[in-house]
Amino acid sequence: MEPAEDLQKVFDKAFAGMREAREAFAPSLAPREVGTITSIATGIAKVSGLPGVGFDELVKFPGDLFGIAFNVDEAEIGVVLLGEYWHLHAGDEVDRTGRVMDVAVGDGLLGRVIDPLGRPLDGRGPVASSHRLPIERPASPIMDRAPVTVPLQTGLKVIDALIPVGRGQRELILGDRQTGKTAIAIDTILNQQGQNVLCVYCAIGQRASAVAKVVATLREKGAMDFTTVVVTEGNDPPGLAYIAPYAATSIAEHFMEAGRDVLIVYDDLTQHARAYRELSLLLRRPPGREAFPGDIFYIHSRLLERATHLRQERGGGSLTALPIIETQAQNISAYIPTNLISITDGQIYLSPSLFELGVLPAVDVGKSVSRVGGKAQRTAYRAVAGDLKLAYAQFEELETFARFGARLDENTTKIIEHGRRIRACLKQPESAPVSVAAQIAVLLALSAELFDGVELNQMTEAEQAVRAAAADMPAEVRARFDSADKLSDEDREAIIQIARVALASFQPAPEPETAPKTKTDIKPKPKAAGGESS
């Protein structure tokens, strides 16, 4: 065979292979929809040329920056930017993604500090997660929900006894600036240690120093092991502040749908409402009351309706929400506070006047309520909570009259003195949750008026003595705290006796009885000088 023929066969074979590969290759041509930035403002961009984009669709900008299509008009699209946008310019290209905003979920987020996009902020590397959920999800239908029947212990005596919270409830915390709203939420998270409850703390528009303090407290107390922290700082774009609570709720819902109990704290929704107002005004949406857009109620209702208690057929998990709201000059009838009060299942109001008096937590029992938590409250609490709340309400009413200097009868004075000791017992330092057994021992001692003989300046030490003595409570009595059984009279008397012994050293010593005078003890009156007149 000639060398030329061999070479020809080699070429023929090679070309035949190329033809087969070319015929087997089917190029997948997909249309790419590209738009153009027309203008940029604070936290938003106007984009033209994306006719197929959908509402809430994620769009991609240069530099791996994403945004959400918020206004969808024929002429242009208003996009909320989810990150730093200083590098963007008019004329830059914008791509559709065909998907909505989602966030990483799963056990890999426990113990981590992330932003609403799922990016780590704690310097511990990427978040380990293989599953993602959209940040906007429909709330569970009514047929999938179960009544709130299990208590969520906060570790705070005034709340667990008088304003109980149940798993699956939405309880609003509201008050003026610097009255301890965040402290109540953090104490509640700390008390979930050992309770098989996972926690999500969502900081919206907070100072970096305040968030760092919260994270340090959670780490110090060992609570970060079961907590995820979602953070947007005050200098972040408003778009991140807007999506933060929705992303945090999706993280919590993943655990709830797996049959677990979850607590989520929104700190605070005032900043969320302001961020949404800023975005709406920039996007030229019509303003309403206090310049908020007309759907401000809807953005909070659709968020908080996702908190619920699922039926056992759906896993039996629960999501308890503690939204925080800030009031101005104690005005709880303002627009956003009244919206949240009507959406939630109750509220805990913190009074600046109580805070100034040193009553911490500064819970105003008269203005606070729990609409569904009472059904979930432990039976042991119910035996004393009703009488205690009535006595405290009577005290607050009478104390107002006592300030005017009115003369009070003995019964009124007794009610006021008893109420002052109730208020002193309900005081509690920050980051110091109290166990159920210790709380019930203190409450029973209050109902039995064992503290009434204790001086007010000794109430803190006396209350601590009762809590310490509660550790000696019989195990069978402790077991009944977690059951639906009522405390028997013998159990109540045993607990009261433990408290009575603990308070013995704080009671005033009885005054010695004086013997009655006899006739021999009576001395005759001395005669006047000069004797009797004749």
From Swiss-Prot:
InterPro entries cross-referenced by the UniProt entry: Alt_ATP_synth_F1_asu (IPR017710), ATP_synth_asu-like_sf (IPR023366), ATP_synth_asu_C (IPR000793), ATP_synth_asu_C_sf (IPR038376), ATP_synth_F1_a_nt-bd_dom (IPR033732), ATP_synth_F1_asu (IPR005294), ATPase_a/bsu_AS (IPR020003), ATPase_F1/V1/A1_a/bsu_N (IPR004100)
A GO MF label: ADP binding
Residues binding ATP: 175-182
Keywords (A to Z) from UniProt: ATP synthesis, ATP-binding, Cell inner membrane, Cell membrane, CF(1), Hydrogen ion transport, Ion transport, Membrane, Nucleotide-binding, Translocase, Transport
UniProt xrefs under Gene3D superfamilies: 2.40.30.20, ATP synthase alpha/beta chain, C-terminal domain, P-loop containing nucleotide triphosphate hydrolases
First and last residue of the signal peptide: none
Enzyme class: translocase
The keyword Nucleotide-binding is annotated on this UniProt entry: yes
Catalytic reactions of this protein: ATP + H2O + 4 H(+)(in) = ADP + phosphate + 5 H(+)(out)
Compositional bias of kind Basic and acidic residues: 514-524
Site (Required for activity): residue numbering on this chain: 368
Protein topology in the membrane: Peripheral membrane protein
Location of this chain's protein in the cell: Cell inner membrane
Keyword field contains S-adenosyl-L-methionine: no
General function of this protein: Produces ATP from ADP in the presence of a proton gradient across the membrane. The alpha chain is a regulatory subunit.
Family as reported in the entry's similarity comment: Belongs to the ATPase alpha/beta chains family.
The protein's name: ATP synthase subunit alpha 2
Species of the source: Albidiferax ferrireducens (strain ATCC BAA-621 / DSM 15236 / T118) (Rhodoferax ferrireducens)
Lineage: Bacteria, Pseudomonadati, Pseudomonadota, Betaproteobacteria, Burkholderiales
